[in-house]
């Protein structure tokens, strides 16, 4: 990784920590989640059409529910991280503060967690 990419990644990690802290999320949990989702690549596209740092599906962004506002631009690191943090917090709150279920719902959807279903695309 070049020095420029390394610096950009560290800047994005710091931004993720700040956004998480402002929402009362564990900053390291959020950083680990974003690292797992995209490796802090704001241009990452997932196989199912997920976009950006938090690997958000456009359909989730269009109608997130749970009082979460849609992001303007999922490729914009700030917009994506803010949406991702808000959505993660909403999922955690939806499951009564249960971090494990909240993170699972972030990845698979609240309905799938309620049904105990883990989609094949998220099993690895």
Where are the regions a protein language model picked out?
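Export/targeting segments at the very N-terminus of extracytoplasmic proteins
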Residues: 1-40, 78-79, 85
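Cell-wall glycan
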Residues: 13, 54-55, 60, 110, ...
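Short glycine/serine/threonine/alanine-rich loop segments
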Residues: 25, 66, 97
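Secretory-pathway/luminal and periplasmic proteins that interact with or process carbohydrate-rich
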Residues: 38-45, 63, 91, 110-119
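Substrate-binding/active-site groove segments that recognize
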Residues: 47-68, 83-87, 104
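A short, structured beta-strand-centered segment in the mid-to-C-terminal lobe
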Residues: 69-80
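Catalytic and substrate-binding regions of cell-wall glycan-acting enzymes that process beta-1,4-linked
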Residues: 93, 97-124
């Amino acid at each position: 990784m070049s020095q420029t990419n390394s610096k950009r990644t560290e800047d994005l990690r710091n931004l993720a920590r700040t956004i998480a802290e402002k929402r009362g999320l564990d900053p390291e949990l959020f950083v680990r989640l974003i690292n797992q989702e995209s490796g802090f690549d704001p241009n990452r596209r997932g196989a199912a059409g997920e976009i950006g740092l938090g690997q958000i599906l456009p359909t989730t962004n269009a109608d997130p529910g749970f009082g979460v506002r849609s992001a303007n631009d999922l490729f914009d690191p700030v917009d994506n991280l803010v949406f991702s943090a808000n959505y993660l917090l909403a999922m955690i709150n939806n499951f009564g503060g249960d971090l494990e279920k909240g993170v699972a719902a972030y990845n698979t959807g609240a309905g799938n967690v309620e049904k105990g279903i883990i989609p094949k695309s998220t099993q690895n």
